[in-house]
Structure formats: C-alpha cells, structure tokens
C-alpha cells in the first residue's frame, strides 16, 4: 500500500469518524434540554463491505485507519471479498495481522486447488500431470456430468479457515467477537441469501464463488454463489443486524478492458461486476440520515 493511498484512507475514515461525532447518539441534539439530562447513548456502528475482487485489500486499509482512530465497530456485513475481509475481522483478527496473512499467501497455490507439494503423499505425486484446476468430469445415468466451476475451491476454503482461526468452533455468527453476516446468491432463484451461522470459512467461500469459475457451495439445501449478484454492498443487512450508523465501503470493480479479459475467472467476474453495480446503485438510493460512504479512489 503506497503512501498516497494510506493518506486517502486516513482522510476518508477520519471524515467518517467526524461525521459520527457530529451526529452523536440517536436522538441527540446540539443543546441538552436539561442540565440533568442523561447523555444519549452512542450510536451502534455497522460496517458494510462490498465485493471488489483483488481490490479487496483496500478494505483492510480502511479497517487499519478506523482502528487507529478508535472508531468502534459493533457488527459487520460483507459480500464476496468484503465477506472475506469482514469475516476475518469479525473472527478477531487485527487488521495488520490480516494484511500480513493476505499479502504473504501463496495465491497461485490457493487457486490451483492443490496443497503444497511437500504435503502430498508420495503415491499421489504421480497425479501431477493432471490439469491445473483438475475439474471433475464423469458420466451418470442422466448423461455427461460437467464440473460446476473450473476451481473446486478446496484450497480456497482451507485458507479461509486459517484466516478465521481465532473463531474456530463458533458456528453462531452472533457469538463471534463482532457479529457478522456474509451475503451470497441462490443460483436457482437469484435471491440474496444472508448466511448467519455454520462454518465461517464456508460462508466466505460461498460469498465469493464466481459462477462458472469457482464451484458453488451448498448450504442448507441451497446452491450458493457470489453474493455480488444479488447484493454487492449490504448496507441494509448491517442496519438489520445492529447499526444506527452504517459505514459502507464500496470498492466495486470497474468494467475490465478487453485486454484484461484473459481467463475464465476474469470473464465470469466481469458479468458479476455488471450485476453487482446495479445492486450497489440500489443500496445507495436508500441511505440512512447518518450513514457514511467510503469509496477509495483505487
């Protein structure tokens, strides 16, 4: 993260903090009605993190500045990369620790759906000739069976378990250090699905499973894919979960140029981005009186 980006984050987050200080708690006015009147309670602050692909590291920068400014976060909602960063933060990871894990990760290995070679049994190393993502093909009584995604997502979910290690064993997302919701999309109906319990790593993977590129995740009988299709900036869910004030961080990915559409993942991601933009626009049409939007210039 370069110096100019850090300054921009600091200015945006500082503006958010000052805006919340200016409005005070629910129902608070500039002048107290009585010297003996009890101070209004401080507003509960929710954080809504958008999807945005590789730009998701920007969420960590915002979290670091909010932490430095001691802005309390009472709940988190996230979509796609926002769910990954938000879920990791909600599990108890400090932003600096999260940034280190993400920057040092072997992303090539993670997206190859294959553990490090040293961890593979000798008898399995002979299978190295298989295709990069090893999608499973087969024949069933219904005909040819094709993979639901180029990437099965096994290594991705394993990495998410590492990110969420502090919350190991917690399945009720209300009982995490910070209450959390991940947003996904039901591929059968197109409905937005709010994941509030179960494996936090699985919830993260469901929220970022780009259709056609990363295999969908089945949770409670529903086949789930990238949440950006149905709700890419879950401001409404942050309000439902806890928030009097929502800090919404929008890092939505702009359309890729033709020269950048070089893989199945980038093509599928482009379609998700188009759909996600519509949902972000819809969310921003209904802002709360005291909500704060942070949109880093990336």
Protein language model regions, located:
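Hydrophobic helical h-region of N-terminal Sec-dependent signal peptides
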Residues: 14-18
């Amino acid at each position: 993260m370069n110096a100019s980006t850090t300054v921009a984050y600091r200015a945006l987050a500082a503006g958010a903090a000052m805006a919340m200080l200016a409005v005070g708690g629910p129902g608070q006015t500039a002048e107290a009605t009585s010297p003996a009147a009890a101070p209004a309670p401080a507003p509960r602050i929710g954080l809504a993190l958008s999807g945005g692909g590789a730009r998701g590291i920007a969420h960590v920068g915002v979290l670091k500045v909010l932490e430095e400014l001691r802005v309390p976060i009472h709940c988190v909602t996230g979509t796609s990369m926002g769910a990954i960063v938000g879920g990791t933060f909600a599990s108890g990871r400090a932003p600096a620790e999260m940034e280190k894990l993400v920057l040092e990760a072997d992303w090539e290995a993670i997206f190859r759906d294959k553990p490090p070679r040293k961890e593979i049994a000798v008898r399995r190393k002979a299978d190295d000739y298989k295709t990069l993502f090893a999608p499973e093909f087969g024949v069933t009584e219904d005909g040819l069976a094709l993979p639901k995604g180029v990437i099965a997502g096994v290594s991705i979910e394993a990495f998410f378990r590492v990110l969420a290690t502090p919350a190991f064993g917690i399945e009720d997302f209300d009982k995490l250090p910070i209450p959390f919701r991940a947003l996904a999309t039901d591929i059968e109906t197109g409905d937005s699905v709010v994941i509030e319990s179960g494996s936090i790593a699985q919830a993260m993977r469901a929220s970022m499973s780009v259709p056609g590129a990363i295999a969908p995740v089945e949770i409670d009988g529903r086949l789930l894919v990238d949440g950006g299709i149905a709700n890419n900036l879950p401001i409404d869910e942050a309000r439902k979960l806890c928030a009097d004030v929502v800090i919404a961080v929008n890092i939505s990915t702009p359309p890729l140029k033709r020269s950048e559409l070089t893989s199945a993942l980038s093509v599928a991601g482009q379609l998700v981005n188009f759909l996600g933009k519509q949902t972000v626009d819809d969310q921003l049409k209904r802002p709360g009186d005291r909500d704060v939007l942070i949109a880093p210039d990336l």
